[in-house]
């Protein structure tokens, strides 16, 4: 490809609204342009990268025996009603009505559609297992799109769904997908960590996210450097260090705390640590009022709570709603007032420790409150607090380390949530009807592209892994007159005929501008031919990742091709 025939709108300045490297560089390198909040146009260079990632995904999926489909983006509301997710998906799902007042969703995911499609196609255990997938545009009405294409409202996703006669078969495919995902991300040049994750509205018994450690990540990962345990903090069980702490207040007594409603305010006033207090969190879901008590220095983990109570979402109660339940905001006692509210106690709490708690009385707290003495029939405590760095590994009790991460892939064991909802049954080996079990496997293609840039950039721009670079080789020519131009064209044609992807910058621009553009865009290999070649036969070849340039005297096209192929193979080998 010749740059003179290409749309190549590179920019020197960073866009004002881009706060992360991938967003800045995708704009500056001419890969994308913004349409509106969370929506992007893909330009030719950016589209080439996307298509290469898609092809890697397709090759690895096909190698496992998965079958590619293409389903409608519009999905009827009936499908979602049948699974119970029309309301559970919340406001993130785009919903539209046609001229006949029929409701549809712009598909954010396709469990329902594939279940509907596969039900009449699967008759017997002999048809199983089957793994089906598509690579398609998805939609989510993100309330705050950010970080360019990392969190956008429209995105390309590979979503796969497997159907099985039993859990053993599901586990085989789950593990095969786990291996395939590592291969996909390795081939894309991404270093990923599989971590245990919460299944959320997807449902199911188990899931793992493929995370890329990055300071801009929106997820918190908890990693064990001793045994290799890794988990999203949303999923990590909380195991606290054992501390020989003695309470400041052992005698039970009501104390005045005027206007002090927060844990920080109360602990400061009384001179106690926040871990000696009990925090009350009042929430409401669609059908429940919820009151959670946990140690004052900890935060509630909503994902654990929702999973435990089998609810889709919750939100804080207002002060008025709290008072209507007979409670005093900021001064709530751990003693449940009535059966109108679901009460949970986090397992961070010690039953025999004298805590500072609310008194159910305006401007008063109680010191020396011991749960097992004050609450009759104390229920089993639940794990609903958020684990943090320094808490203990659930496998080996080594302190956990926290890292921020970007999710690029997610695999789920869905169980029979959708197959039951859609009545997907086959005849087993004994001729009896059996409900199938499912798996689900997703990869964000655009997000993978952006995350590669987050890992592969420097002060000059992007340095693409050669497997997904828009072009493998940049040929920069610095010529005067047609004779020199035609000589360089001979180099271009030879490389192209050897099957090497070449982007020839033949624009009538200064050498500095061309060289900076090639480094900004991030072509893995650059060949520069200019004045020195026409004087002494000297050519330079540049490795963008290493930022290393070597010069040699041209001795023939075979030698040049061999040098390029050697560098290509070196760059591909680094991805393995």
Curated annotation (Swiss-Prot):
Q: Which InterPro entries match?
A: aa-tRNA-synt_IIb, aa-tRNA-synth_II, aa-tRNA-synth_II/BPL/LPL, Anticodon-bd, Anticodon-bd_dom_sf, Pro-tRNA-ligase_IIa, Pro-tRNA-synth_IIa_bac-type, Pro-tRNA-Synthase_IIa_type1
Q: Which GO terms describe its biological process?
A: prolyl-tRNA aminoacylation
Q: Which PROSITE patterns does this chain map to? A: AA_TRNA_LIGASE_II (PS50862)
Q: What class of enzyme is it?
A: ligase
CDD domains recorded = ProRS-INS, ProRS_anticodon_short, ProRS_core_prok
Which GO CC annotations does the UniProt entry carry? cytosol
Q: Which GO terms describe its molecular function?
A: aminoacyl-tRNA deacylase activity; ATP binding; proline-tRNA ligase activity
Q: Which Pfam families match?
A: HGTP_anticodon (PF03129), tRNA-synt_2b (PF00587), tRNA_edit (PF04073)
Q: Where is this protein found?
A: Cytoplasm
Reactions performed catalytically = tRNA(Pro) + L-proline + ATP = L-prolyl-tRNA(Pro) + AMP + diphosphate
Assigned keywords, A-Z: Aminoacyl-tRNA synthetase, ATP-binding, Cytoplasm, Ligase, Nucleotide-binding, Protein biosynthesis
Name the Enzyme Commission number(s) assigned to this protein: 6.1.1.15
Q: Domain notes, please? A: Consists of three domains: the N-terminal catalytic domain, the editing domain and the C-terminal anticodon-binding domain.
Q: Which NCBIfam families match?
A: PRK09194.1, proS_fam_II
PANTHER family on file: MITOCHONDRIAL RIBOSOME PROTEIN L39/PROLYL-TRNA LIGASE FAMILY MEMBER (PTHR42753), PROLINE--TRNA LIGASE (PTHR42753:SF2)
Question: How does it associate, per the subunit comment?
Answer: Homodimer.
Recorded family membership: Belongs to the class-II aminoacyl-tRNA synthetase family. ProS type 1 subfamily.
Summarizing the function annotation, the protein's role is:
Catalyzes the attachment of proline to tRNA(Pro) in a two-step reaction: proline is first activated by ATP to form Pro-AMP and then transferred to the acceptor end of tRNA(Pro). As ProRS can inadvertently accommodate and process non-cognate amino acids such as alanine and cysteine, to avoid such errors it has two additional distinct editing activities against alanine. One activity is designated as 'pretransfer' editing and involves the tRNA(Pro)-independent hydrolysis of activated Ala-AMP.
Identify this protein by name.
Proline--tRNA ligase
Q: Which organism is it from?
A: Leptospira interrogans serogroup Icterohaemorrhagiae serovar Lai (strain 56601)
Task: Specify the taxonomic lineage.
Answer: Bacteria, Pseudomonadati, Spirochaetota, Spirochaetia, Leptospirales
Q: What's the gene?
A: proS
């Amino acid at each position: 490809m010749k740059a003179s025939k290409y749309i190549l709108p590179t920019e020197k300045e960073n866009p004002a609204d881009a706060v992360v490297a991938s967003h800045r560089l995708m704009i500056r390198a001419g890969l994308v342009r913004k349409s509106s909040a969370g929506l992007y146009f893909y330009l030719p260079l950016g589209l080439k990268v996307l298509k290469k990632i898609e092809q890697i995904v397709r090759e690895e999926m096909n190698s496992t025996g998965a079958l590619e489909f293409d389903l409608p983006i519009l999905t009827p509301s009936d499908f979602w009603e049948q699974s119970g997710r029309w309301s559970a998906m919340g406001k993130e799902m785009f919903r539209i009505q046609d001229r006949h007042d029929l409701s549809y969703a712009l598909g954010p995911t396709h469990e329902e559609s594939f279940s509907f499609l596969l039900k009449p196609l699967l008759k017997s255990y002999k048809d199983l297992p089957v793994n089906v997938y598509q690579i398609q545009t998805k939609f989510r009405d993100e309330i705050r799109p950010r970080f360019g294409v990392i969190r956008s409202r429209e995105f390309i996703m590979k979503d796969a769904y497997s159907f099985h006669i039993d859990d053993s078969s599901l586990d085989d495919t789950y593990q095969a997908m786990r291996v395939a995902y590592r291969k996909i991300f390795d081939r894309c040049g991404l270093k990923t960590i599989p971590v245990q994750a919460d299944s959320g509205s997807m449902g199911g018994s188990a899931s793992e996210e493929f995370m890329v450690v990055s300071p801009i990540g929106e997820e918190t990962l908890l990693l064990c450097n001793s045994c290799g345990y890794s988990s999203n903090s949303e999923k990590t069980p909380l195991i606290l260090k054992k501390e020989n702490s003695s309470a400041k207040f052992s005698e039970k007594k009501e104390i005045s705390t005027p206007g002090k409603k927060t844990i920080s305010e109360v602990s400061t006033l009384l001179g106690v640590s926040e871990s000696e207090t009990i925090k009350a969190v009042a929430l409401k879901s669609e059908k429940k009022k919820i009151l959670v008590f946990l140690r004052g220095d900890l935060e509630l983990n909503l994902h654990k709570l929702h999973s435990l109570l089998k609810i889709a979402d919750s939100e804080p109660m207002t002060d008025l709603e709290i008072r209507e339940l007979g409670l005093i905001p900021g001064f709530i006692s751990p003693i449940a007032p009535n059966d109108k509210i679901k009460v949970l106690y986090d397992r961070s709490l010690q039953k025999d420790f004298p805590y500072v708690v609310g008194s159910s009385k305006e401007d008063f707290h109680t010191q020396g409150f011991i749960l097992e003495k004050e609450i009759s029939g104390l229920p089993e405590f639940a794990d609903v607090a958020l684990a943090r760095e320094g808490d203990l590994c659930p496998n080996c009790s080594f302190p956990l380390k926290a890292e921020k991460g970007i999710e690029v892939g997610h695999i789920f064991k869905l169980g029979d949530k959708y197959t039951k909802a859609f009545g997907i049954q086959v005849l087993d080996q004994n001729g009896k009807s059996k409900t199938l079990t499912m798996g689900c496997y997703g990869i964000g293609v655009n997000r993978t592209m952006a995350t590669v840039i987050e890992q592969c950039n420097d002060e000059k721009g992007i340095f693409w892994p050669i497997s997904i670079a828009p072009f493998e080789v940049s040929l920069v020519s610095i010529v005067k007159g047609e004779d020199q131009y035609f000589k360089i064209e001979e180099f271009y044609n030879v490389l192209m005929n050897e099957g090497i992807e070449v982007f020839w910058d033949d624009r009538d621009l200064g050498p500095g501008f061309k060289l900076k553009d090639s480094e900004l865009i991030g072509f893995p290999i650059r060949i520069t031919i200019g004045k020195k070649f026409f004087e002494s036969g000297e050519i330079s070849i540049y490795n963008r990742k290493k930022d290393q340039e070597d010069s040699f005297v041209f001795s023939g096209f075979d030698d040049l091709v061999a040098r390029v192929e050697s560098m290509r193979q070196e760059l591909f080998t680094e991805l393995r």
